[in-house]
Curated annotation (Swiss-Prot):
Domain FAD-binding PCMH-type: from-to ranges: 48-284
Residues that, per the record, bind (R)-2-hydroxyglutarate: 405, 503
Domain of life according to the entry: Bacteria
GO molecular function: 4 iron, 4 sulfur cluster binding; D-lactate dehydrogenase (cytochrome) activity; D-lactate dehydrogenase activity; FAD binding; flavin adenine dinucleotide binding; metal ion binding
Cofactor: [4Fe-4S] cluster; FAD
UniProt subunit comment: Homotetramer.
Listed EC numbers: 1.1.99.39
Cystine crosslinks: none
Protein purpose: Catalyzes the oxidation of D-2-hydroxyglutarate (D-2-HGA) to 2-oxoglutarate. Provides the way to recycle D-2-HGA produced during L-serine synthesis by SerA, by converting it back to 2-oxoglutarate. The physiological molecule that functions as the primary electron acceptor during D-2-HGA oxidation is unknown.
Protein name: D-2-hydroxyglutarate dehydrogenase
Domain 4Fe-4S ferredoxin-type: 665-696
């Protein structure tokens, strides 16, 4: 039995007092002090980890004013704050050990848009892609491009002065910030924008500013004016100019304007809370073309890049073979393999993605033609190691290429082995003309340590992302981490560059003095003193105030690995999904129609995300290791939950009801909101697979605490369903009674229970004169006779609750000339796995696997109708049974149809089968698990419908919110409905439900209960076409 985990770091009393007083000040936002909430924001996208005391989620600028004004009381002077946005920073910018102020949950409003003048005013928590989605109908966009654009907030972009692809033309974020509204540490609101330099320097009273604002404007303007010559002379001359703090660009080129905004952009929250921003917008280019140039080596791609820049391309992105090979193993490659074809004998080892864009089509065509002509000449003469190139000008193809490039960062984290590519020297920047030589020396530095690494980036701007693979759980490699960091810092100085060309400084700030002269470093500290004299805003980053004894963070600041190292290696291996999470945050994707992660999308609570759940489990494992729990105790295959422990479990459960704390309860709360949709198992670049370690957690959690009755009912549904189906009328009568529904809700916590099929599947098969065959008859058939037979593998949901789907699939296959055989129903066990009955699941899976292996030996295809169940044979069965699983293979309905429809005889037969003479427009709503594990399935369904003379439109939808039993649990009703409304309801609205199709039983059930319509399975639509 596992121990009670109650020894956790407590919140300091002075912080609790502050939070109590803040609530009395009518703070409207959220306050979080739970250990789970603190853990979820203890990390960002870096290797670092610091546990905050508390998290504040303000709703308004007024809330931030309340936060800061209260903090100025004498008793709260020791409290420090760190603003936080999307948490995508790679250098620890948004973590600290005091109070985090997270603006991403509530401050997400787009406040004002002026299309004519091309500007927009937003709150700091707006996500970049969210803004561009809003702007797209107006033909406008916010330019700076990031690989994390679907979860990075504009406040975070401003604070790090982010930039990315296309920066030669579009510049950095600061080039597009027209004005800011910020809150100072003293609680005053600071508005900044471009003002007349003369007014600032000589007539400050002419400006409508507060007294403190006047002082900031005038003092900084005077200092930057006095130091202007030194600033221009001593700072690196780069497209990715030095920010944090941007001394150079506070004045425009002719020094007629002064803009304090440029000091705040890139300040990483160390000067003020940036709350709102007025942003410059650009016209969306009407015409875009990519030329994807393939090379035999990365060095060739790198050295060929300046040639592309001279062709006046908008951007040149370079990717090495390490990243490309990881992409080929990911779901993303299915979307780009036709755009990046290769010969196995001549593989792509380097790639340049060259983009031309603008509103003059003829000009772009000329540029593309000219470059292609030069490339053809080089290929003809075997120059520059170019394999070939492919051109794409359609927007969907362009977006797919860039989606692959954006995912490259996360893909590196999925490298095999304990050493993982990590960010710490990944955004160095040197003058583009020095890049090839610089990278050559950089690679030599890494090669001398025998390190693996991936490279990709913006070679046109002299920025290349490099992530060396290190195992920071190994203390020797931590030393190497420091050594490499120091050496690369010196290398960038040697080549006239910067250690931070794109992602800000963060904990790397302690290298800052190396890149500034003593005179200019003093100016930075002076600016910090003006804004934050007591070093209370993101302390340890950028610089410290003058006369401060505080120090900057070290590159060896507390790391995630410091905690992970405490967990035995065997346990890390058993829970490697949780351990491998690198914080990339793709599960925070704002897109409401993306599959990952449904609970995070509607709750806005990062605990309820794959990253949050991974953090919970890692800490759970660490705390148990500290309680001397052995690896054997955390191997469900080696543990038994004995009946003799029932009394103890009952006692523990009573203590839980009485409010006794156990961190395991917080972990369980995070796991209870997981829908087990499996999106994270494929959509996450690291493929962390929360449902897998969630099931293990439930198994162990319930070795200490009793299970709720509903878990036992769910786990035994497959056993009971066949018996209940024989008396469907009887059970349905009682299920429909209001008193029964109320009783079930109150006592079992279940609601909206589905009705058994009437008539039953067996009765419906009798009606269509279906006849099966015995095993003896099947074994006596010849190979030719077996060719027309298929085995239908039943699942409990369609067979007993949606039997018409099975009947119609039988009829469809018969009409196509096949002889379907319905195999005897046997439990699959998926529900047991979801609820953590792992011992029972393994036994059930073994029985089903033995049966299906026996059937597979007959050489007859096995076909299932519900994709979630079919895919469990490939996933959960493989994990649980390993080599004992056998080699049986169950096809989904569309896989079987696709295979059969490739037969010329069947194609000819299909032409002669009587079917509707109309081409109907159907809409497919794919099951989320099917979409993630089988990314080509929607396209394959389209091909199948095309064979039937029909048009199938695929709707991009997220999770429906049902997910098996999740949507039937009373505690999940609010979340289930919100998940449904955010995607499915919107996509179904306005469409004729008769032509809307859903492959998943759960999805059809969810639509039925909220829309009161019944969607068809695609096989039913095909049958209708044949009728």
């Amino acid at each position: 039995m596992l121990p009670n985990l109650n020894r956790i770091p407590q919140v300091e009393q002075y912080v609790l007092d502050y939070l109590d007083d803040l609530q009395c000040q009518h703070f409207e936002g959220d306050i979080a002090t739970n250990y789970a909430d603190r853990l979820s924001l203890a990390t960002d996208n870096s290797v670092y980890q610091q546990l905050p005391q508390a998290i504040l989620f303000p709703k308004t600028v007024a809330d931030i004013v309340r936060i800061t004004k209260l903090a100025n009381l004498p008793e709260y002077q020791s409290i420090s704050f760190t603003p936080r946005g999307g948490g995508t920073g790679t250098n620890g910018q948004s973590i600290n050990n005091n109070i985090i102020v997270d603006l991403s949950r509530h401050m997400t409003a787009i406040l004002e848009l002026n299309v004519k003048e091309r500007w927009v005013r937003v709150q700091a928590g707006v996500v970049k892609d969210q803004l561009n989605q809003f702007l797209k109908p107006h033909g406008l966009f916010f330019a700076p491009e990031l690989s994390t654009s679907n979860r990075a907030t504009l406040g975070g972009m401003i604070n790090t002065d982010a930039s990315g692809q296309g920066s030669l033309q579009y510049g950095k974020t600061s080039n597009h910030v027209l004005a800011l509204r910020a809150v100072l540490i003293n609680g005053e609101i600071l508005d900044t924008s471009a003002v007349n330099s003369v007014d600032v320097l000589e007539n400050i009273d002419a400006l409508e500013l507060s007294e403190s604002s006047k002082k900031l404007h005038q003092t900084i303007a005077q200092h930057c004016k006095e130091k202007r010559a030194a600033i221009i002379k001593d700072l690196p001359q780069l497209n990715r100019f030095l920010t944090g703090y941007d001394l150079k660009n506070v004045f425009n080129e002719d020094e007629s304007e002064f803009n304090l905004t440029r000091i705040l952009t890139g300040s990483e929250g160390s000067l003020a809370f940036i709350c709102e921003a007025k942003l410059n917008l650009l016209l969306i280019p009407q015409y875009r073309t990519l030329i994807n140039i393939k090379y035999r080596s990365f060095d060739a791609a790198l050295r060929n890049a300046p040639f592309m820049v001279k062709a006046n391309a908008l951007s040149v992105e370079t990717v090495d073979s390490k990243v490309l090979n990881l992409a080929k193993q990911d779901i993303i490659w299915h979307s780009v393999n036709e755009l990046l074809t290769e010969d196995e004998k001549d593989p792509i080892l380097g790639l340049n993605i060259v983009e031309f864009a603008g509103n003059n089509k003829e000009k772009i065509d000329r540029q593309v033609t000219a470059l292609c002509r030069l490339l053809d000449e080089k290929i003809e003469h075997n120059q520059d190691h170019i394999i070939g190139y492919q051109v794409c000008s359609d927007l969907p193809s362009i977006e797919r290429i860039y989606a692959m490039r954006k995912k490259a960062v996360g893909l590196l984290g999925n490298a095999k082995g304990a050493a993982k590519p990590i960010p710490f020297v990944e955004d160095t920047c040197v003058p583009p003309e020095n890049l090839a030589d610089y990278i050559s020396e950089f690679r030599a530095l890494l090669d001398q340590h025998n390190l693996q690494y991936g490279m990709f980036g913006h070679v046109d701007a002299g920025v290349l992302h490099v992530r060396p693979a290190l195992d920071l759980c190994d203390k020797e490699q931590v030393k190497l981490f420091k050594q490499i960091s120091d050496e690369v810092a010196e290398l960038t100085i040697k080549y006239g560059g910067l250690l931070w060309g794109e992602h800000g400084k963060g904990v790397r700030s302690h290298y800052g003095e190396k890149f500034f002269t003593p005179e200019l470093w003093h100016e930075l500290r002076y600016i910090k003193t003006l804004f934050d004299p007591n070093n209370r805003l993101n302390p340890g980053k950028i610089c410290t105030p003058l006369d401060s004894k505080d120090e900057l963070y070290s590159i060896l600041s507390p790391m995630r690995a410091d905690k992970d190292r405490q967990i035995p290696i065997q346990i890390r291996d058993e829970f490697k999904g949780a351990m491998n999470c690198n914080g990339n945050g793709l599960c925070f994707n704002f897109d409401e129609h993306s599959i990952m992660c449904p609970s995070m999308k509607v709750s806005k609570n990062r605990v309820f995300s794959p990253k949050g759940r991974a953090a919970m489990v890692r800490e759970w494992l660490r705390l148990m290791a500290n309680e001397n729990v052995s690896p054997e105790q955390l191997d469900f295959r080696k543990t038994e939950i004995k009946l003799t422990a029932l009394v103890k479990r009952l006692s523990n459960t009573v203590q839980k009801w009485r409010g006794n704390y156990d961190f395991s309860h917080e972990v369980k709360a995070a796991m209870d909101t997981c829908l087990a949709c499996k999106a994270c198992a494929s959509q996450c670049p690291i493929k962390i697979d929360v449902p897998s370690f969630r099931a293990k957690f439930f198994h162990f959690y319930h070795s200490r605490y009793l299970r709720p009755t509903k878990d036992h009912i769910v786990a035994n549904l497959e056993i009971a369903a066949p018996y209940m189906a024989k008396q469907a009328k009887f059970f349905n009568y009682f299920t429909k009674l209001k008193v029964t529904q109320t009783l079930v809700e109150k006592t079992l916590g279940m609601t909206d229970l589905p009705l058994l099929s009437e008539p039953s599947l067996q009765q419906q098969l009798v009606e269509i004169h279906y006849q099966g065959k015995s095993l003896e008859e099947l074994e006596s058939l010849s190979a030719v006779e077996k060719n027309d037979i298929l085995f239908i593998v039943q699942d409990p949901y369609t067979s007993y609750y949606d039997a018409k789907v099975i009947r119609d699939f039988v009829m469809l296959t018969q009409k196509l000339g096949f002889k379907p055989i319905l195999l005897p129903f046997k439990p699959n066990g998926k529900a047991m796995h979801i609820k953590g009955f792992l011992k029972r699941f393994s036994k059930t899976a073994q029985n089903q696997a033995e049966f299906l292996n026996r059937m597979a030996k007959l050489g007859i295809p096995l076909v299932g109708v519900d994709p979630a169940i079919v895919l469990s044979y490939r996933d959960e069965y493989k994990e649980a049974l390993q080599e004992k699983r056998g080699d049986f293979h169950v096809l989904t309905a569309h896989e079987w149809l696709k295979q059969r429809l490739q037969n010329a005889d069947l194609q000819e037969k299909l032409k002669n089968i009587a079917k509707t003479d109309r081409t109907l427009g159907w809409y497919l709503f794919p099951h989320c698990t099917e979409s993630t594990f089988m990314p080509n399935s929607p396209k394959e369904w389209q091909e199948i419908f095309g064979r039937f003379g029909q048009q199938l439109n695929v709707e991009k939808v997220g999770c429906c919110g049902m997910a098996g039993v999740f949507g039937h649990e009373v505690q999940n009703q609010k979340m289930s409905r919100e998940i449904y409304d955010v995607s499915w309801h919107k996509k179904l609205h306005g469409k004729d439900p008769h032509f809307c199709l859903a492959t998943g039983y759960s999805c059809r059930s969810q639509v039925k209960r909220y829309e009161h319509v019944v969607l068809k399975h695609p096989v039913q639509a095909l049958l209708e076409v044949l009728k």
